[in-house]
Amino acid sequence: MTCNHRIDRRSFIAGTFATGALVAAGAAVCGCSAGAAGSGSDGSPAPEGLTADPKPAADATLAANDAVYALLDFSDERERAFATRGLIAAPEALEITDDVGKVVWSQKAYAFLDGAEGQPVGAPDTANPSLWRNAQLNHLFGLFEVVDGIYQVRGYDMTNITFVRGETGWIVFDPLMSCECSRAAFALVTEHLGERPVTGIVMSHPHVDHYGGIKGIVSEEDVAARSIPLIVPAGFAEHAVAENVYAGNAMGRRAGYQYGTFLEAGPQGKLSIGIGMGQSTGTVSYIAPNDLIAATGETREVDGVLMEFHMTPGTEAPAEMNTWFPQFKALWMAENCTGTLHNLYTLRGAEVRDGNAWANYLMEAKARYGAEAQVTFQSHNWPHWGNDVLNEYLVNTAAMYKFIADQTLMYLNQGLTSNEIAHLIQLPPALEQSWYTRQYYGTVAHNAKAVYQKYMGWYDANPVHLHALPPEESARKFAEYLGDANAVLAKAQVDFEAGYYQWVAEVTNLLVFADPTNEPARLLCADALEQLGYAAESGPWRNAYLTGAKELRGGVDADPKYRATGSADIQRAMTPDMMLDYLGILLDADAAADLDLVVNLAFTDEDPYVLTVRAGVVLYERGAQADDADATLTLPRLGMFAILNRDEDAQAKSIQVEGDPDVVRKLTEHLATYEFFFNIVEP
């Protein structure tokens, strides 16, 4: 390679994909032998011995996981020391239930991580040793002291909940995802630190695991009666609602893959997701914030505690902020510095994040507070103490995101595609070998793709890919050209034994999309995904691989308990604009192609709107009414839910119609109903 890092694509592809080399980002074996997967003679028998049972780690997986011990210093116990430091109290076992006894959060499910007399259990063959170590540290739960006056309850949900002692009560940071979990955490604090009221709440950013448990510690009535400040970054409310509504159904289904919702915890199942032990499944709530922070340097004094806020929009969330506590010399880093490589793109789906901005905000935090800070702490994982330690922590974390952003841009400017770059970039040893820069949540590979997407979008400029065939149609033509499917499977079986799991997964999944009833293809694809999962260092990658394997073997488990139902509180926070946008999303344009309506919406508690439906499209104007409207609907803002939910009883109670009496029926008869349990690894 020359000094300007110019890459010959053909050499790169041949060297990377054909070797079956260990991919450092996921510690997974990948490769291909595309030339060996051609057509075979008609009538070849299917490979024997394929079953729907989970398999042990294969030889190549064993080798990949064993190589991790040579890569990382497992004698370095500093992160474990930080994770255990300051423990005040913890129950012997932790399982949190809702009002009807359903388990919504369990650390008992991960008891297999515990060793005798507190000694850690060694990693099994079916787990990447680095991820196993992370899971053991995230399995720690209880009440911890950060400094005198700042306390965290960790391991009671995916997120940490933080309690800052004021003169009369607690200022709470990020009240978890579920009310049941935050209530249990607050009870633990009260038991060991005394009874004190909540006197303020800071929610660092609008992801549900950082605000959904708010009603477990306060009520709306309490907030109003005691004027409790609910402090958030500007833009919090809009993003909190929009992210969970517009693409909520698809995000919810995909989140099941990311978080391992359908998997049992265990050595062959789900472990840590890198920033916690998965998502709780309790009651999600929302209370509208009442104090917005708009600019870095703004301060608030709540219950005698002075806080200075550092705005970091476009990092881990579109609206996010760090907090500096000068009297404690403590720096709260929200979810911007979490002891692992985070996501520039999240597998459940979301807008991509800006790696360059993320790095710059971390360096800005260091410049503003690094000279004085004695501890950094955040919403996931554990604090880091010591001025030298935390400054190095901030710099190394910033360097990860900056490296990925810069190197992706360097290679894309040489013409490499997103997928090529993802297989090429690897963190330098100075970054890769630190325990807090490991790829437990995000990976270099999919973060590089996020950078490519941010700057270049989905298109790689190859016109062959400009309007590619849908996967099912393409797969059928591939299968037709390949010929005898059993001959393809026989060759795939050979490649499986050689450890080319990614290629085997790709070619067998092609056969599945061509014919979903091809059971040998399904089972071999599942086996390949399973081995990729066993070797993955990223918790979400492991979950995705193992969930795909599970669904190929047994189909989609459509048990309603797995369905992401959303939060009524979040839905009630929707503005009229959001509701009307969502009406347009729900409208089946083909079915409503001939529908032509103009409707006045006379909200009793909001500005009026004119709603136009034309050519299958919903358009609206705020602050207007049409003289020639087909009808006028008088309703409260929340009455729109009667339309969106097609609830005729609620419509009759909440909506007054003047004009066309059938207008509500016309608006709702072509609204789509979403199937939550849609297929992912098969057509």
Each language-model region and where it sits:
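Conserved beta-strand hairpin/beta-sheet module of binuclear metal-dependent hydrolase folds
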Residues: 136-196, 321-325, 329-335
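N-terminal secretory signal peptides
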Residues: 1-11, 18-30
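Divalent-metal (often Zn2+) His-rich catalytic cores of metallo-beta-lactamase-fold enzymes
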Residues: 49, 53-63, 340, 356-420, ...
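Metallo-beta-lactamase
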Residues: 145, 169-170, 177-180, 194, 231, 236-313, ...
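Feature captures hydrophobic
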Residues: 36-38, 43-46, 491-494, 500-506, ...
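N-terminal pre-domain segments of enzymes
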Residues: 43-134
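Active-site metal-binding motif and surrounding structural segment of the metallo-beta-lactamase
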Residues: 168-169, 180-231
